């Protein structure tokens, strides 16, 4: 293989194949590095984490400006009378999140799990009430646009982009063309960054295995089985049922494509925001309506949190079973609703779904001290829990967007 063909494969070949190669090389590198540590004087696999950090940082950096520009361009050029399907997509997001929480409740009752409540060393500042989460979301909507871009506050970015887009619908065609050209330029930068995904995955896998390994997870096998099993059930059973209800045909080719492209990347980046550019690229490749996906995907990264709802529910019920608290069916359903609301605010809280566990624990009179210990357990299993949660959250964003768009096409055909 000559240099040009090798370069073409590394940066222009099938992305999933290249990511798979990066994954395998990362695992091999992490296994081999300890034997080289004495000769080199440092752990080489840990140093490779820099490659992963650069990749994730690049995606996170470009995501806010990508969303801002694409939404403005899409709405400014929106044809009068055209339909964006946003109402259907938001319904799908909310239904999917609630059903995810219900799935976690059933799984937890089928396989009751107890945990060793270790002392949590991290300094935590969990919100005290559900109203605080909802208030934070409202304040995010009216955030300063520069601050929203700087802090990657996607709710604020969407609010300003939608407002500017509506206003620019009355601008001249020249102005609209400039916005389109700007959006295209940012999209090309995103495409360039995504081409480095295999190198980023290689660095992330090598450093993660070198740092924590899998030994830290062995004490929580059953808890992880319930968590990951619930997420897999939602991904391969619940979501396909919802998609079939919308598109009225075999949903699995679409489900598999979304998991294969979006889910795999999100699993390693562990960031819904960082995966927005990947979802945008996939939506474009699926020929979805740009006016729809340019808004629904960043919105989904904020409110479509089925994986977070599962995490909150499973860990809360694990604490409940550990403490011997009786749980009635109505209370379990209420927990699903609370977990769904909490999950929708997870992106606006530092620490995500884990720091919202005290809200759900408060339903059962569990103190914040004990809830904080549950969060500590969450941090221990986070290497797998957070990755799987993000993969489910992010792949569902593009899946439900595609389902709504395809449903609309079916109605119009």
UniProtKB/Swiss-Prot annotation:
Q: Recorded GO terms, molecular function?
A: neutral L-amino acid:sodium symporter activity
State the family named in the UniProt similarity comment for this chain. Belongs to the dicarboxylate/amino acid:cation symporter (DAACS) (TC 2.A.23) family.
The portions of this protein that span the membrane are 21-41, 61-81, 89-109, 146-166, 189-209, 224-244, 305-325, 337-357, 363-383
Give the GO biological process terms: serine transport; threonine transport
Q: How does it sit in the membrane?
A: Multi-pass membrane protein
**Protein name as annotated:** Serine/threonine transporter SstT
Organism from which the protein derives: Mannheimia succiniciproducens (strain KCTC 0769BP / MBEL55E)
- Whether Ligase counts among this entry's keywords is no
Location in the cell reads: Cell inner membrane
């Amino acid at each position: 293989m000559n240099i040009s063909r090798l370069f073409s494969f590394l940066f222009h070949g099938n992305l999933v194949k290249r990511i798979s190669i990066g994954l395998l090389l990362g695992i091999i590198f992490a296994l081999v590095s300890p034997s080289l540590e004495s000769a080199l004087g440092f752990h080489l696999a840990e140093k490779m984490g820099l490659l992963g950090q650069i990749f994730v940082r690049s995606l996170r950096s470009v995501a806010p400006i990508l969303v801002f520009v694409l939404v403005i361009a899409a709405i400014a050029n929106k044809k009068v009378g055209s339909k964006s399907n946003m109402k259907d997509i938001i319904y799908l997001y909310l239904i999917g999140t609630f059903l995810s929480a219900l799935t976690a409740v059933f799984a937890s009752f089928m396989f009751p799990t107890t945990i060793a409540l270790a002392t949590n060393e991290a300094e935590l500042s969990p919100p005290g009430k559900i109203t605080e989460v909802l208030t934070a979301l409202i304040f995010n909507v009216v955030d300063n646009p520069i601050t929203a871009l700087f802090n990657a506050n996607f709710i604020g970015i969407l609010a300003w982009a939608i407002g500017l887009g509506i206003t620019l619908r009355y601008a001249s065609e020249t102005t609209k063309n400039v916005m389109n050209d700007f959006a295209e330029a940012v999209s090309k930068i995103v495409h360039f960054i995504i081409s480095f995904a295999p190198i980023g995955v290689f660095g992330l896998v090598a450093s993660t295995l070198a740092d924590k390994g899998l030994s830290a997870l062995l004490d929580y096998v059953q808890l992880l089985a319930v968590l990951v099993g619930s997420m897999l059930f939602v991904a391969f059973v619940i979501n396909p049922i919802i998609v079939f209800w919308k598109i009225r045909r075999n949903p699995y080719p679409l489900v598999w494509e979304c998991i294969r492209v979006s889910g795999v990347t999100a699993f390693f980046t562990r960031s819904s925001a960082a995966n927005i550019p990947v979802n945008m690229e996939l939506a474009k490749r699926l020929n979805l309506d740009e006016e729809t996906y340019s808004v629904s995907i960043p919105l989904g990264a904020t409110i479509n949190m089925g994986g977070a709802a599962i995490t909150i529910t499973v860990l809360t019920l694990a604490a409940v079973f550990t403490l011997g608290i009786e749980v009635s069916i109505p209370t379990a359903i209420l927990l699903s609703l609370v977990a769904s609301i909490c999950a929708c605010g997870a992106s606006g809280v530092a620490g995500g779904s884990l720091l919202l566990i005290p809200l759900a624990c408060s339903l059962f009179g569990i103190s914040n001290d004990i809830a904080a210990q549950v969060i500590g357990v969450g941090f221990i299993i986070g290497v797998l829990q957070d990755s799987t949660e993000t993969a489910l959250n992010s792949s569902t964003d593009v899946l439900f967007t595609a389902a709504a768009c395809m449903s609309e096409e079916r109605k119009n055909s």
